[in-house]
Regions:
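N-terminal secretory signal peptides that target proteins for export/translocation
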Residues: 1-11
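Transition segments tied to proteolytic processing and entry into folded domains
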Residues: 2, 30-212, 226-227, 246-249, ...
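Bacterial N-terminal signal peptides
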Residues: 16-26
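Structural detector for internal amphipathic alpha-helices that build alpha-solenoid repeat scaffolds
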Residues: 184, 206-217, 239-272
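Alpha-solenoid HEAT/Armadillo-like helical repeat scaffolds in large eukaryotic proteins
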Residues: 196, 200, 227-236, 252-253, ...
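Residue-level signature of the C-terminal ends
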Residues: 216-217, 228, 232, 271-276
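Eukaryotic acidic, Ser/Thr-rich intrinsically disordered low-complexity regions
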Residues: 286-321
Length: 322
């Protein structure tokens, strides 16, 4: 009887050993799988549209639903004489993006002569419910500015437009959240070099060379810059000069005085891509910086997820619909 128990015990131990070895083999196999490099992320910057609702939402610091009032007599005077700035007031019903506590808002729009076809909305929507897209005054003080031209900064307020814009604001908050966003960030030599150059920005003797090299890297540096730009450390060199690529520019270089890493990276991104998501090249408020970072993250998310083929299919669909 005792021998029988010993035999059973030996069999149990043998079985346990086999199971243990199998589990170890499985763990080893999993580890090897984890070591296989992930497929590089492809960023299709050519698929980014020139005009899009998501771009307008990303660029805007504030999106407000309400009733705006414009002095149409003053507007006509400007159009009959010369271009100029016109002040507006807006009675606020709700805020779709941004943090505003007031019930009324003053803002400014530059009116060009001749009147743009889109500017007819100033007359059509005067005194009516509308949705307005705003950015802060680039100078950092004074009234808010409307985003771009009237066509994309002032639209009629309906339940459908409110829903669409509110959904886009929510979506951008979700895709720019760290956990979601960092899944599209690269882990390559360009990103590593960007990290090294950002470190050099804290050394007085190396900062200017870091700015120059980062700009020269061009689009190769863009994903790494955007993924690492949420950096509030002070710069060792708080000035940068970037060549004006616009042939109509009145000076050869634009000169900025960034204060933090995020400020100078925004200036370099604007220089490389030609896209502006805020005016923090000379510093800015925490809210302004945070909105700029979110906007650039939204831009990269679309570059990683919107293929050129998808854009072409959409364009063909639009042509068919027209």
């Amino acid at each position: 009887m005792e021998k029988k128990h010993l035999k059973i015990l030996r069999n149990v131990r043998f079985f346990t050993a086999i199971v243990t070895l199998a589990m170890m083999a499985g763990l080893t196999s999993c580890k090897k799988t984890d070591d296989v490099p992930a497929k590089p992320i492809k960023y299709n910057f050519s698929a980014i549209p020139q005009k899009s609702l998501w771009l307008d939402v990303a660029k805007s610091q504030f999106i407000i639903a309400g009733t705006f009032q414009v002095d149409t007599i003053k507007l006509k005077e400007i159009l009959e004489t010369e271009s100029g700035y016109l002040n507006f007031t807006l009675s606020i019903d709700s805020v779709l993006k941004g943090d505003l506590q007031s019930k009324e808002l003053s803002f400014t729009k530059y009116i060009e002569k001749p009147l743009s076809s889109n500017d007819s909305n100033l007359f059509l929507l005067n005194g009516k419910k509308s949705i307005d897209f705003f950015i802060e005054n680039p100078a950092g003080n004074g009234p808010l500015f409307m985003l771009g031209n009237i066509g994309n900064s002032l639209i009629s307020k309906t339940e459908d437009t409110i829903k669409v814009i509110a959904n886009e604001v929510k979506r951008q908050q979700e895709i720019t959240d760290d956990k979601t966003f960092f899944s599209i960030c690269p882990n390559d030599k360009n990103s590593a070099r960007v990290k090294e150059l950002i470190a050099d920005m804290h050394i007085g003797t190396k900062a200017n060379d870091a700015y120059i090299e980062l700009e020269k890297m061009g689009f190769d540096a863009v994903p790494g810059i955007i993924c690492q730009m949420d950096d509030r450390r002070e710069l060792a060199l708080k000035q940068i000069s970037l060549e004006n690529k616009n042939p109509d520019a009145w000076e050869a270089y634009s000169h900025y005085n960034p204060e933090l890493v995020v400020d100078v990276l925004d200036a370099i991104l604007d220089q490389i891509i030609g896209q502006n998501f805020g005016f923090i090249e000379d510093g800015g408020t925490e809210e302004k910086r945070a909105n700029t970072v979110r906007a650039w993250r939204t831009y990269l998310w679309h570059a990683a997820n919107d293929s050129l083929e998808q854009k072409q299919v959409f364009q063909e669909t639009q042509k068919t619909a027209d």
